[in-house]
From Swiss-Prot:
Function: Plant defense neurotoxin that causes pain and systemic symptoms in mammals via modulation of voltage-gated sodium channels (Nav). Potent modulator of human Nav1.5/SCN5A (EC(50)=55 nM), Nav1.6/SCN8A (EC(50)=0.86 nM), and Nav1.7/SCN9A (EC(50)=208 nM), where it shifts the activation threshold to more negative potentials and delays fast inactivation. Also shifts the voltage-dependence of steady-state fast inactivation of Nav1.6/SCN8A, but not that of Nav1.5/SCN5A or Nav1.7/SCN9A. On Nav1.7/SCN9A, principally acts by binding to extracellular loops of domain IV (Nav site 3).
Chief localization: secreted
Localisation: Secreted
Tissues/organs with expression: Expressed in trichomes, that are stiff epidermal hairs located on the surface of petioles and leaves.
Protein name: Beta/delta-urticatoxin-De2a
């Protein structure tokens, strides 16, 4: 969960166009703190603290960030998820636990699992346990 959150937050960072290097540094620092599970206290917030996502959203919006990206950061990927058979990617995640065949130009596919003794990898997860190798593993 933290990895996907960090990825979305880092993509939000690249989508921003800050007017000052200081603001960009604040965004990077906030994003890294959230990725590490730390509480973010935004200097922009009038309340002096609070929800991590709200602090980052406010910071990104003040610095000219992408509103769609901020919405995804706050609402999660299921708010505007992509149904099975439709184009997907990092910014357009699949619904109901299905997976995307490619991070940029993929298609939402029904999630399936591989039984013990069969080849597994990132796109072919094991039904029981973890795949020992992300590309050329065998389910144990």
């Amino acid at each position: 969960m933290k990895t996907s959150t960090a990825l979305v937050l880092l993509l939000a960072l690249t989508a921003t166009s800050a007017s000052s290097g200081d603001h960009q540094f604040i965004d990077e620092q906030n994003i890294m703190n959230v990725a590490e599970g730390k509480n973010v206290i935004s200097s922009l917030s009038s309340s002096g603290g609070g929800d991590d996502a709200a602090a980052i959203m406010e910071s990104v919006l003040v610095n000219g960030g992408n509103r769609k990206m901020v919405f995804m950061m706050v609402s999660g990927s299921q708010a505007n998820c992509i149904p099975t058979g439709q184009p997907c990617g990092v910014l357009h995640q699949c619904c109901d636990g299905n997976f995307c065949t490619d991070p940029f130009y993929g298609t939402c596919t029904v999630k399936h699992c591989v039984p013990k003794g069969q080849p597994c990898g990132v796109l072919h997860p094991c039904c029981e346990g973890m795949c020992p190798d992300p590309i050329y593993g065998t389910c144990r």
